[in-house]
Amino acid sequence: MRAKRVRSRRELKAFIDLAPELAARRGDTDHYVPLFTSDIAQWHSHSGWFNEDVELWLIVDESGAPVARTICHSSPELAAKIAASDRPARATSDDVMPSNTTDTTDPAGEASLGRPSTLFFGALEAADAEALDHLIAHIGFRADQLGARRVFGPVSPLPNVTGGMLTAGTDRPGFFDTAWNPAFYADSFHAAGFASWGPAQTWEVEVGSIPAARATAVTEAEWEASGLRRRRISRFGLPAFVRRLLPTLNAAFAQLPYYTQISTAQLKSQMQGLTALMDPELIIDIAGIKDSSETPSRCFALVIPDPLPVLRRHGGRLGPSAILDLLVHRHELRDAVLIIQGTDPDFQGRGILSMAIRDLNSALCAKGYRRLRVTFIAEDNPASAAVFERSGGEPMHSLSFFDRHLDGRRR
């Protein structure tokens, strides 16, 4: 097996198509989570919101057929964040939140990442443990070439987009905006000397099991008594909601050791297709009773019907046919995904999140959803997990990042 840098459109197509092909070969089609192909194409062309160069790599077998893939990239901001603490800091309680041979014929390409202190990897796919072992060896080889002292991932391309690797619960399917991988991935990384970093869990709440007290909508009198109001979101009002949540989002997550500030361009990219998919009743935007329509949210929860069945059918391509598919089948999507929630640090500890989740649970019940799934809650943030535990939820997957110091130090 050997590593091959993706350079042509044909190789880019092979990189993109490898994920659904391997999932079908392994019998994991109903478990895997495709990345948006538009994101992968932008990484390859060095366009889009992510400012750093991204290298796309394939591991190919003796016949030249791809058997594994990854991206390698740098991020000075993320490298500085994780270097600041060898032990992940506690998240705030109101916040949720991912070959020995190489093709080196292009010296300019080899220097494209400069000399990063940390080499990040992501978008992992591997046919089996042998292919993954070659891929891990190549990631280390590439880090040595670039002079990186640390290797960290998976992040695609940042933890605030998609990050982490499942270490338990791989028998459960993945869902939108989170990671899924076969069980052998974590075993291979541990065997290669990587240490787990920032363990976390996803959660699942069976809507029919939510206690009545946690699924009763907040009354207008309760909102008023708390000096609050819920701003209703329409499809036409989604852009304004995105503008309001961004400052709250960045403030709420600023202390997390893996979180880098989200730009307007990044958030807009991550919201692609949301207008066609959203259920307005599941988007929570809490403001002060006297706040204007443009005042940033005091608390928010971004929840959508899980589009993964449609995205799997289209291999992660969110083109016109996929959008039409979403519109036609939107009412058949009975699982919801809480992508992100946050509370302005100035308003945390006042019970606002509990009220927001009550309204959310009430809407889930009223609209006939089967379950709510929640992305990535760090294990050192039990207060946030407790919100969903009180709603009858249970952990679904365990996951972590994987970290290796190339100078021999272990975390």
PLM region descriptions:
Residues 1, 205-208, 403-409:
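Short beta-strand-to-coil "C-cap" segments at the C-terminal boundary of structured domains/repeats
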Residues 66, 76-79, 159-161, 292-299, ...:
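Flexible loop/turn segments at secondary-structure boundaries
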Residues 82-192, 315-390:
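Acyl-donor binding region in acyl/amide transferases
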Residues 133, 239, 243, 261-268, ...:
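Conserved structured core elements
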Residues 179-258:
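Acyltransferase donor/substrate-recognition loop-hinge adjacent to the catalytic core
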Residues 390, 395-401, 409-411:
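A structural motif corresponding to the C-terminal lobe/cap of the Radical SAM core domain
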